[in-house]
């Protein structure tokens, strides 16, 4: 596979979801217009918010949309509702699948494999589950995946719970899965920190997609 250039952003600050979503859309449109433009990777943390996919069931929100205490965004991705917050590492990939494999199922499974490799680096045993998208430790979900795709240019990506307030998931039915238990990496490896996980995420994505990263 020929190496592709990808712009990578790894902010140290906690980012507002909508700002980063708009940035993804800009890079997606740039690739649609000219696929010689670089792919785009964003790795960071968000302020507390909830996001829903295109066909999400609002019944999976256990609070009123009229409640101003919650930031809710309906976005261009599959899947049901999830939660983002500090202490959770989010990775967005805006890339041209025509350069890899024009198969969304392949891409979802590829992301699961990447997450399993990331956690394996920290000696955390985890797995995917037949019939579901994401990664689990035992019966607890540790990572969620949601993607959108337009003309084979992807958007959104995955989140891994590192050391976040899992109680925030009690406000929703996570990913539409009843009685879904969530987990943090820190509960399985006390020695890790989010900056080290971020470094490993970057490394494994670079290896798996043969990227030449350019910071911007």
Curated annotation (Swiss-Prot):
Q: Where is the BPL/LPL catalytic domain?
A: 35-213
| Additional information | In the reaction, the free carboxyl group of octanoic acid is attached via an amide linkage to the epsilon-amino group of a specific lysine residue of lipoyl domains of lipoate-dependent enzymes.
Encoding gene, per UniProt annotation: lipB
Which pathway does it serve?
Protein modification; protein lipoylation via endogenous pathway; protein N(6)-(lipoyl)lysine from octanoyl-[acyl-carrier-protein]: step 1/2
Q: Where in the cell is it found?
A: Cytoplasm
Q: Which Pfam families match?
A: LplA-B_cat
Q: Which organism is it from?
A: Prochlorococcus marinus (strain MIT 9215)
Q: State if Cytoplasm is listed as a keyword.
A: yes
At which positions is substrate bound? 77-84, 144-146, 157-159
What is the name attached to this protein's record?
Octanoyltransferase
Positions bearing the site annotation: Lowers pKa of active site Cys: 141
Its function, per the record, reads: Catalyzes the transfer of endogenously produced octanoic acid from octanoyl-acyl-carrier-protein onto the lipoyl domains of lipoate-dependent enzymes. Lipoyl-ACP can also act as a substrate although octanoyl-ACP is likely to be the physiological substrate.
């Amino acid at each position: 596979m020929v190496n592709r250039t990808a712009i990578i952003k790894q902010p140290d600050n906690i980012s507002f979801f909508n700002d980063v979503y708009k940035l993804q859309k800009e890079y997606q449109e740039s690739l649609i217009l000219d696929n010689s433009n670089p792919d785009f990777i964003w790795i960071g943390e968000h302020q507390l918010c909830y996001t829903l996919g295109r066909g999400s069931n609002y019944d999976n929100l256990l609070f009123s949309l009229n409640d101003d205490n919650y930031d809710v965004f309906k976005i261009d991705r599959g899947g049901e509702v999830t939660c983002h917050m500090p202490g959770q590492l989010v990775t967005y990939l805006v890339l041209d699948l025509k350069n890899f494999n024009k198969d969304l199922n392949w891409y979802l499974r590829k992301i699961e494999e990447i997450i399993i490799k990331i956690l394996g680096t920290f000696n955390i045993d985890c797995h995917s589950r037949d019939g579901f998208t994401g990664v689990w430790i035992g019966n607890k979900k540790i990572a969620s995946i949601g993607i959108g795709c337009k003309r084979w240019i992807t958007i959104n990506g995955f989140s891994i719970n590192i050391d976040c307030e899992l109680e925030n998931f009690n406000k929703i039915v996570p990913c539409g899965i009843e009685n879904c238990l969530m987990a943090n990496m820190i509960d399985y490896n006390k020695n890790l920190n989010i900056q080290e996980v971020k470094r490993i995420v970057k490394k494994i994505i670079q290896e798996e997609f043969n990227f030449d990263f350019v910071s911007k």
